[in-house]
């Protein structure tokens, strides 16, 4: 007679399907189609296969239906039957490289897409990426989601039990599970591997054996010999003798759960396909173990029952972001990998979120249409650039190219719609106060606050006017300050839908302009004036320029305005003085270079490291664009650094050093100070020819503080200035690398 079951294990079949990680998009798409075809067949034909979690996303359904559009009804049937859990995400982003608005749009798009098929997974499933943002509980609760599964990662010091109340800065709470050992893969590694493969994943015996493990092929072209092997037969093995120990071990690896007799076991892994033997494995587990009932279920089923078994008042509370490390789980190294992707993404976000969409929305309230379909396509390109592997570039070069392509499409769509909105605005303007031949400038302020600043603009005047210098005036004639930079000749096409492009010959004047106040989210119209003319054919007596003698550039190495003073040092660093307080910050903007034998995800210094400072090299320093509104100092430093690192077959095991061969790394910085600004603008570019290293910008503050602050997602993240140490007084230096958005401060 079988003993009555006193414990329950909810086993969730799932996969983690990276859209493009190990393989580029179309190789991955082929594998996805094979996977989805098989999954649908199992769900439709095996009544004991009660459900499958499709990784918390919906873009994989979108991708699949591009190839198999005829299967949309089949997918919808499984979603509506509760057997296929999809969403709430559209794509699976890494959080810290992308804007908070993008996370909200991602969730909204995923939920809408899922609802079209029958409904979305009501659990915040987020086991991907490298760290969780502090405001997730508020974001999820605003969407009606009260439970979460989160990994990568909260420490056991903060959450000694798997379950905790995750609390955001506004006080919103989610009942959350961090899962146990091997997190989302515990059932796959501890149950699937022994029973299906007669193997243990974390054992040294896990290796492919030619002629024994299965049949695999590999392309032998020498140029792609590094490509993976692919198995072409299906695994039919089943080792029932391993069931009891494997099932018990899987159960035991969730021993940190708050409810000892009710546990969540996740049976899936990266790119894992549905296991058709899973119902049999669970039936055999029930037969082999007397007191535990193993049954397939869903995250929703697990949390519904968990809620009944706990007292929320006794559940530990965890505040804020979840990125406690170890470094391989939450290192910021991925944030610094292929930085050009992040830069282009920031530009795309600015165009879509802060400029194009707000103006189009505002104009639509005045009776104009809103280009919804265009914006939907722009957001699709942007969100498809945000999967955690794609946005960080921890992929092959082909995928990097694809990600950049998507970002560029989003930018082009956003810029096009912005120009269309400006054209619509111009048609609506009352310009009766100006003469028909006046040249006008429309100054648009997309920010949610009034601005008055110095900007750099290019203003064209007809060549037949022979304008030597321009001015700019308010609508009432009040002049605005202008600083001339340069002038050149162009012939510019004028697009006309009713004619061929018209050639328009112009003088292009590059100037700095003090805008005067522009209202929040608004605009102003100003007039271009012709301050001086010249004889274009004159060769011997050029028109001379006058100066007000109040230039911001004091010398080739010094800038000063009302609030700040900058002095550049011979080594390329600079000293910054706040004139309102007298405080001086010295030796800013040194460059530090050191070896890195880690990988995409974690920084790892070679054992025999060399740290090289730009302060050991001379710099070339010059002044440019000097005038009363703006001035810039250029700094060029050429550092000699090791060409690469030398290490053994396994980078982390003992041997590693930087090479003796040196290469030049040219660093060019441009420091700009504008009239009236209380901040300094610095643009630095690096021509990198070396490998296996990292480059850091050093900004000493001499401020003693316990905390540092950084812009996060709809909050300011406060973190310890020094990373918290463990009981032995140690910490991982890599975890001192912190993410930031628009700013960081101490």
Residue ranges and their predicted role:
Residues 11-13, 50-54, 85-88, 122-124, ...:
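Hydrophobic faces of well-ordered beta-strands that scaffold small-molecule active sites
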Residues 104-142, 233, 249-264:
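CE4/NodB-like, metal-dependent polysaccharide N-deacetylase domain
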Residues 8-17, 22, 159-432, 444-446, ...:
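Active-site and substrate-binding clefts of carbohydrate-active enzymes
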Residues 190-191, 200-202, 372-376, 384-685, ...:
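Catalytic and substrate-binding regions of extracellular carbohydrate-active enzymes
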Residues 52-63, 89-92, 124-133, 151-158, ...:
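Short, solvent-exposed turn/loop segments enriched in Gly/Ser/Thr/Pro and often Arg
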Residues 676-718:
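Acidic (Asp/Glu-rich), glycine- and aromatic
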Residues 137-145, 165-169, 282-290, 311-312, ...:
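Short, surface-exposed basic-aromatic patches at helix termini and helix-loop junctions that form
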Residues 1-97, 101-105, 113-115, 142, ...:
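N-terminal catalytic cores of secreted or lumenal carbohydrate-active enzymes
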